[in-house]
Structure formats: C-alpha cells, structure tokens
From Swiss-Prot:
Region annotation Interaction with the nucleocapsid (N-RNA): where it falls in the sequence: 459-507
Domain observations: The N-terminus consists of a long intrinsically disordered tail. The central part contains the coiled-coil multimerization domain (PMD). Forms a four-stranded coiled coil structure. The C-terminus constitutes the alpha-helical domain that binds to the nucleocapsid (N-RNA complex).
Protein family: Belongs to the morbillivirus P protein family.
Residue spans of biased composition, Basic and acidic residues class: 189-199, 222-233
Compositional bias (Acidic residues): 137-160
InterPro entries referenced in this protein's UniProt entry, alphabetically: P/V_Pprotein_paramyxoviral, Paramyxo_P/V_N, RNA_pol_Pprot-P_XD_paramyxovir
Protein name, per record: Phosphoprotein
Length: 507
C-alpha cells in the first residue's frame, strides 16, 4: 500500500511540474470545463437528487473547500448539482479565469490506474484535475464528479493506515484522504507514511523474520493502533483507529467544534472529558530508587526496548558467528597452502628417485663391462716391487669366466702352464704377457707424471710461468722472473732457469 501511495504522489508531482512548465490558455480551460460539465450532467442527475435530499436533512449544502490566503486564489471544489448547480460553479471558475494577470490554470486529464495495473480509458472514466500553476504553497488539486465511481480506491475496504474511507458522493471529502488525488507531499510526510506502514508490517509478521526497526520520529509519539470496524447503517463501513494514550499527565486538549453535521446515527459522548484551560502537573508513581516514572509510558516503551535489545543481541550473535567462520576459513586456507607445498616437495622427491634409478642402471651397465686392472706393470724398473709376480688366477669383477681376461693377454693360457717346481703352489708368470700389452718403462729425460723436465717447447714455458704466478713471492720478484723468462733462449738455459726457480721456492 505504501508503494502505491508513493507512486500516486510521484505521478501527481510530475503532473504539477508539467502544468507549471507549459500553462494552457484560459479559453482552452473554459472550453474543456464546459465539455466536461455537459458530459457529466446526464450521468449524475439521479445520484445528485438523492444527495440533495440527504443534504437537506443534515442542513448542509454541497461541499466546497475554499483555499484563501496570501498568494493563493480562492477556488472551490463543487460537485455537480444538476442544471442549477452547474451555473454557480461556472461563474466562480469564470471569475477565477478572468484574473489572468495573477494566475494561470489549465485542465489536464489524469489517467487512473486500478490495482491490477490496467489503465482506465476515456474522459468520463478519468479524474479531471484542475491545477493552479502559481506558487508552491498555493497549489490545490481536486478531481471531477465521476471520481467516486472510477477511482482506483475501493471505499468499502478499510484503509490499513487507519483513516476513514471517503464517500465521494454525499459526504464532505478532505483532499488529504483521497488516494487518487494529486497532492504536494513533502519528504517528511512520505517518510512518516513509510514509517507507519513498516510499523504495521512489523506487528503482523512472524517472529522469525528479522525486521529492522523504523527511524524514530520525535514529532509523532509511537502508539499501538488497532483497527475498529462497526456498522453505521449506511452503504460504507466506518473505519477508525484506537490507540493508547502516551501522555503521562495533564488535561485533555480542547477541540474545535465541527461545522459539519453527523452523516449517520449519533454516537454517545458521555465519557468525553471537559476542556480545561489550566492544569497543574501530575506526579507519577515513585519507584524504590526515588525516580518518578509513569506506568503507561513504561508499558509503551518496554516492548520497544525489549525489541531493540533482542535485535541488538541477534545482530551481535550474527557478527560473532561471521567472525568465527572467517577464522575457520583462514585456518583452512593455511592448511591447504601447506598441502600444496607438500605436493611440490613430493613431486621433487619422486623426480630425484627416478634420476637415481637411472644412474644406478647406468653404473650397473658399466660395471658389467669393466675388468680389474692387472697390477705390476708400468712401474719403474728400479722400484723394488717391480719383480712381484702377477697372480694369474685374477678374475674380473662381473660376468667373466675364470681366467678369461688373463688368458687373452698372456702368451699361454694358465691351464696349459706348469710350474717348474712341483713343490711350489705359485705359478710363475713373469715375461708371459704379450709384448703389445706390456707397458714401456718411464723415461727420466722426458716429462711425466712424476717429474717435470723442461725443454724448448711452448708448453714448458707455460708451465714455468704458472709456477711463478702461483708462488708466494712478491709482485716485484714475480715481474723480474717473468722478464728473465722472456729473455731466455734454448732448452739448456730454460732447464737452468727452472732449477734456479726451484731452489728459490724451496728457500
């Protein structure tokens, strides 16, 4: 309901802005009004006759709402009274249109939409809205005579906000109570309307739904409203509100006497309090702590306080649960990251194992083709261990027959050889190797792994330069020795320089 009311308010404001931006000619307004009066005369004649009889009984005339004030035009809302009543309305409207120097007006047909969203077509079915395009405070809007039949508001249903339904035909209607009329509604009034609607929804919803409390308003005291429905012996149903008083003390305010008579049976007013111009403040009941409070105000405030406390506690519980979920999520993410790192380490270990398996297979393949070297050859003849006999039964490491390698290098196989002395177990094998397999003795006059013998080659000079650079001598002496090495010519001089260098390094 609140959304529909806000929709109508927005539509009304758009209509007012359009009328202010593009005012019509007064002649066009007069012609449109005359056409509207002629169209609505025949349809409202029967209903207005019954309204006149009821108005005579109540001693009231057709309702007209004057709007007089500074900066406003005096305009009346007159329902069609037949052939005689329409002339008075035409005269007043003609006088209002004649004053074109002060105000400019226009008539616009406001399209009415029912609750299903369907548009009501036709001039007769629409609300004829007369809008004054003057100042903002002086804008008054009213509808035509056919609005009670084609309006989108059902007068038989009670208003959820608690306001009485309007009888568009015979009873005086306030423009503020019509949902289809266009009004200038301020932002504060819209906010109050939304607050009342949300408060009613909060009272009717189940307790499981989390409802945010409305914004507190200091202008209007909060009170629990209860709709009242009872018969009034007429076609419509009276709808009102019953609210508990939030006042803690004082007197009943005097109310102005209404100028309109009752439209139905009289109601008893025996319990109404008389007005008072002056009253002394009342004291509430004192509590044990010494503070003065009111039982009524406490009964009104305590439900709201309890609701606020419950809402606050629920919000705190939700925040705590969300924080715990966040902490658990962080722990899970940390463990997942550790699992990812472990997976990488496992993959690297598997790769290393596969590499080691390949290396072991390669080594096994190499060992299958390697034989043990026979010791005793390639030695210096002057070495005392040079005459040691070689074991002829030496076997290879892997996959070789007994004596296979030795039989290939010996002049005679070991099985065919016989020992000279039958009493000796050893088999003499010296000089039995083939000549091509025997190692040559080391020459003392040439360079080998055991000594360096310089000659006139470039390699010998490079070796001597390396010896000088790697020595512990000073830089000056190194430079001096390098210069001497460059000046030496011949192998003999180079050998003498090498001997001198060895002596210098030993000292």
């Amino acid at each position: 309901m609140a959304e529909e009311q806000a929709y109508h308010v927005n539509k009304g404001l758009e209509c007012i802005k359009a009328l202010r931006a593009r005012p019509l000619d007064p002649l066009v307004v007069e012609e449109a009004l005359a056409a509207w009066v002629e169209t609505s005369e025949g349809q409202t004649l029967d209903r207005m006759s019954s309204d006149e009889a009821e108005a005579d009984h109540q001693d009231i005339s057709k309702p007209c709402f004057p709007a007089a004030g500074p900066g406003k035009s005096s305009m009346s809302r007159c329902h069609d009274q037949g052939l005689g009543g329409s002339n008075s309305c035409d005269e007043e409207l003609g006088a209002f249109i004649g004053d074109s120097s002060m105000h400019s007006t226009e008539v616009q047909h406001y399209h009415v939409y029912d609750h299903s969203g369907e548009k009501v077509e036709g001039v007769e079915d629409a609300d004829s809205i007369l809008v004054q395009s003057g100042a903002d405070d002086g804008v008054e809007v009213w509808g035509g005579d056919e609005e009670s039949e084609n309006s989108d508001v059902d007068s038989g249903e009670p208003d959820p906000e608690g306001s009485a339904p309007a009888d568009w035909g015979s009873s005086p209607i306030s423009p503020a109570t019509r949902a289809s009329d266009v009004e200038t509604v301020e932002g504060d009034e819209i906010q109050k309307l939304l607050e009342d609607q949300s408060r009613i929804r909060k009272m009717t919803k189940a307790g499981k739904t989390l409802v945010v409390p409305p914004i507190p308003s200091q202008e209007r005291p909060t009170a629990s409203e209860k709709p009242i429905k009872k018969g009034t012996d007429v076609k419509s149903t009276s709808s009102g509100t019953m609210a508990e008083s939030s006042s803690t003390g004082g007197a009943t305010r005097p109310a102005l006497k209404s100028q309109w008579g009752p439209s139905g049976p009289n109601a008893s007013a025996e319990n109404a309090l008389a007005s008072a111009s002056n009253v002394s403040p009342t004291q509430g009941s004192k509590t044990e702590s010494g503070t003065t409070t009111s039982r009524i105000s406490q009964s009104n405030i305590e439900p709201e306080d309890d609701y606020d406390d419950e809402l606050f506690s629920d919000i705190q519980d939700i925040k705590t649960a969300l924080a715990k979920l966040h902490d658990d999520q962080q722990i899970i993410i940390t463990r997942l990251e550790s699992l990812v790192s472990l997976k990488g380490e496992i993959d690297s270990i598997k790769k290393q194992i596969s590499k080691q398996n390949i290396s072991i297979s390669t080594i096994e393949g190499h060992l299958s083709s390697v034989m043990i070297a026979i010791p005793g050859f390639g030695k210096d003849p002057n070495d005392p261990t040079a005459d040691v006999d070689i074991n002829p039964d030496l076997r290879p490491i892997i996959g070789r027959d007994s004596g296979r390698a030795l039989a290939e290098v010996l002049k005679k196989p070991a099985s065919e050889r016989q020992s000279k002395d039958t009493g000796k177990l050893g088999i003499e094998s010296k000089g039995l190797l083939k000549k091509e397999f025997q190692l040559k003795p080391i020459e003392k006059k040439s360079s080998s792994a055991i000594r360096f013998v310089p000659d006139g080659s470039v390699a010998s000079r490079s070796v001597i330069r390396s010896i000088i650079k790697s020595s512990h001598l000073g830089e000056d002496r190194k430079d001096y020795l390098m210069s001497l090495l460059n000046d030496i010519q011949g192998s003999k001089d180079l050998a003498q320089f090498h001997q001198m260098l060895v002596k210098i390094l030993k000292n």
